[in-house]
Amino acid sequence: MKRTFQPSILKRNRSHGFRIRMATKNGRYILSRRRAKLRTRLTVSSK
């Protein structure tokens, strides 16, 4: 049986990346909450 998680960096960034987060109001809210928590990585695409 095929496993459910088939990693793809491109798909990951397109759904959870920085530019997608910035594109919506709720996405910007997520980033602001992560900045408030002083997260070193705001999104999966940031290194």
From Swiss-Prot:
Cross-referenced Gene3D superfamilies: 1.10.287.3980
InterPro entries: Ribosomal_bL34, Ribosomal_bL34_CS
Domain of life per record: Bacteria
Biological processes, Gene Ontology terms: translation
A molecular function GO annotation: structural constituent of ribosome
Gene Ontology cellular-component terms listed: ribonucleoprotein complex; ribosome
Keyword line: Ribonucleoprotein, Ribosomal protein
PROSITE patterns registered for this protein in UniProt: RIBOSOMAL_L34
PANTHER family: LARGE RIBOSOMAL SUBUNIT PROTEIN BL34M, MITOCHONDRIAL RIBOSOMAL PROTEIN 34 FAMILY MEMBER
Family classification: Belongs to the bacterial ribosomal protein bL34 family.
Name listed for the protein in its UniProt record: Large ribosomal subunit protein bL34
Record organism: Buchnera aphidicola subsp. Acyrthosiphon pisum (strain APS)
Recorded name of the encoding gene: rpmH
